[in-house]
Amino acid sequence: MSTIIYPSPIFGPVNSRRLGVSLGINLMPSDGKVCSFDCVYCECGFNADFRPKKKRPTREEVREGLEKVLKERHDNNQPLDDITFAGNGEPTGHPDFKGIVEDTMELCKKYFPEAQVSVLSNATYIYKEEVREALMLVDNNILKLSCTMQDHGRCPC
């Protein structure tokens, strides 16, 4: 399997079977992977193989990048079905996740009110109230908590 490291906070769009034309938001460093798990099936590879040297994008950097792309797509009549938090690791691990979600919902409504906002997450940070509050704002939570202990079932992570 090839490894993908997303070099920008905003990537795509990609054509998704589930989500349609989907613009991605990567809240992790652009040069590596930061995730609470190390799943064998992850397209970003293993954490140890891609240790980042750069910092995570700031809330302002994400907002500016997202607005630029959304405005351009809107002005050029390019369709968009979904904005998806995904990328180089676990998006809910970003310290400003809730604020970034709030900004994303605002910009989505402004430029593509018919589009959805989705989060691909391994659900490890849902114990944090702020993460739960942020997840309640989005349209589509795609949460997948894989087992991490062999005696509890199939454990890909």
Annotate each language-model stretch with its function.
Residues 1-18, 71:
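Auxiliary Fe-S-binding modules of radical SAM enzymes
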Residues 50-51, 151-157:
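A short acidic, helix-capping loop that chelates divalent metal ions and anchors anionic groups
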Residues 43, 80-82, 147-152:
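Short, basic/glycine-rich phosphate-binding loops at helix/coil junctions
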Residues 53-67, 92-137, 145-149:
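Canonical radical SAM enzyme core domain
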Residues 46-82:
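Conserved alpha-helical substructure of the radical SAM core
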Residues 19-61:
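Canonical Radical SAM [4Fe-4S] cluster-binding loop centered on the CxxxCxxC motif
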Residues 22, 82-84, 116-118, 140-142:
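Structural preference for beta-strand elements that scaffold enzyme active sites
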Residues 27, 85-87, 121:
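Short glycine-centered, acidic/aromatic-flanked micro-motifs in structured strand/loop junctions
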